[in-house]
């Protein structure tokens, strides 16, 4: 099933299919539920066959996990359970590890660092559901390090994985676009906008749209035309920018922009030698960057005008309070109280340096000025507060390990 989505001869129609998938899911969740289980039904015997197992597993993991946000937007629970992607990843990683006899010692170390926090809770308020919600993500990361240990992914396989992550993002874009009312009916204030996200969480939708922007740009700059039509690819890319800006959730668009700039920096200044078989054409960097920046700025200006200049105020960190003079524009205001949450996590870590307060416990224990406890929005501070020194080591290993591994690779 998934291999047909990677057939370049029908690439345009694969994108049209995913646009229709998002459009129809906006009216009935039966569509995405049916598609999700059709993919599982056809892929299960495919991955049981061990021929080219890693390639098939990688494709299944990326595509099924990428469908989750669309499923959440369409409110498919309990048919497609909440957080299903974490369980799918865990199951498929374990399947691949067992069949391949992987021994990723770095991943085992990560597991050893993250698991202890599951066995204590200083808040005495962490339910089993909350515990699993908080611990499964880091566990999947550790299992992923073990699973991918020793795998060689060539350029073609990498681009296929990028496409499989991009297709569901296009569906999310279509869903949000269809559910967005007429712009004249939307009250654009200086906070995240749920009208332009299909009524779903603006942070999650904005993140997917920012990821879609980055992946589209990555394929574009590497000379890979997604739909076999350059103009259509450009429309998709600008669609991600337009809808992402309209969410008024800054993280997704800023994250996408930072990812693009980081990519260009690495492509320009990397000292890695390029092989003839997997060469990425570096001279195209400037050729693609300049028109992309111009179009991006034009879209930003259009959306800013559409929202009565509220978009530019939002990205400056202004709120109704700061404009009225009743609130000071500082780092905490600019980050929508995330800085205060970060400091609260650091305070918890100071009091529990070695082990932290336990997985999921920081929400109830964090000292903030908010009446309702808020979940952490910065993964580093959550790791420090809940896992202590072991959380810090977990983060540092994840940060350093890819670069140390990359030094051993002589070609791209």
Residue map of PLM features:
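Aromatic-anchored transmembrane helix interface
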Residues: 79-93, 106-150, 163-173, 208
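Helix-loop-helix junctions and helix-breaking kinks within/between transmembrane helices
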Residues: 22-34, 73-82, 128-133, 200-206, ...
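A membrane-periplasm/extracellular boundary helix in multi-pass inner-membrane enzymes
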Residues: 180, 246, 264-327, 347-351
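N-terminal signal-anchor transmembrane segment
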Residues: 2-98, 116-124
């Amino acid at each position: 099933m998934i291999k047909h989505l990677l057939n370049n001869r029908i690439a345009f129609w694969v994108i049209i299919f995913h646009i229709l998938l998002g459009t129809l899911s906006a009216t009935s969740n039966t569509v995405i539920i049916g598609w999700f289980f059709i993919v599982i039904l056809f892929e299960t015997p495919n991955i049981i066959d061990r021929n080219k197992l890693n390639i098939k597993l990688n494709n299944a993991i990326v595509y099924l996990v990428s469908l989750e946000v669309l499923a959440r937007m369409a409110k498919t629970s309990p048919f497609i359970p909440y957080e299903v992607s974490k369980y799918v990843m865990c199951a498929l990683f374990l399947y691949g590890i067992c069949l391949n006899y992987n021994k990723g010692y770095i991943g085992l170390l990560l597991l050893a660092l993250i698991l202890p926090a599951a066995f204590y809770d200083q808040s005495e308020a962490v339910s089993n559901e909350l515990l699993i919600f908080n611990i499964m993500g880091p566990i999947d990361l550790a299992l992923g390090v073990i699973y991918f240990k020793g795998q060689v992914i060539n350029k073609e396989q990498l681009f296929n994985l990028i496409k499989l992550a991009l297709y569901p993002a296009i569906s999310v874009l279509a869903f949000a676009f269809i559910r967005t009312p007429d712009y004249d009916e939307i009250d654009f204030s200086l906070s995240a906008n749920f009208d332009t996200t299909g009524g779903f969480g603006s942070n999650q939708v904005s993140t997917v749209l920012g990821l879609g922007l980055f992946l589209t740009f990555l394929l574009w700059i590497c000379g890979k035309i997604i739909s076999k039509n350059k103009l259509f690819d450009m429309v998709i890319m600008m669609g991600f920018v337009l809808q992402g800006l309209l969410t008024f959730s800054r993280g997704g668009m800023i994250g996408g922009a930072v990812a693009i700039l980081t990519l260009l920096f690495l492509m320009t200044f990397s000292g890695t030698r390029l092989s003839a078989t997997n060469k990425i054409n570096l001279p195209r960097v400037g050729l693609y960057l300049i028109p992309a920046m111009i179009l991006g700025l034009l879209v930003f200006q259009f959306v800013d005008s559409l929202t009565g200049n509220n978009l530019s105020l939002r990205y400056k960190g202004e709120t109704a309070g700061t404009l009225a003079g009743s609130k000071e524009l500082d780092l905490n205001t600019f980050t929508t109280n995330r800085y205060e949450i970060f400091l609260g996590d650091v305070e918890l870590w100071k009091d529990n340096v070695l082990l932290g307060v336990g997985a999921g416990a920081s929400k109830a224990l964090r000292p903030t000025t908010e009446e309702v406890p808020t979940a952490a929005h910065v993964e580093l501070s959550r790791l420090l507060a809940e896992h202590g020194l072991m959380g810090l080591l977990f983060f540092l290993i994840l940060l350093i390990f890819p670069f140390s591994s990359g030094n051993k690779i002589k070609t791209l």
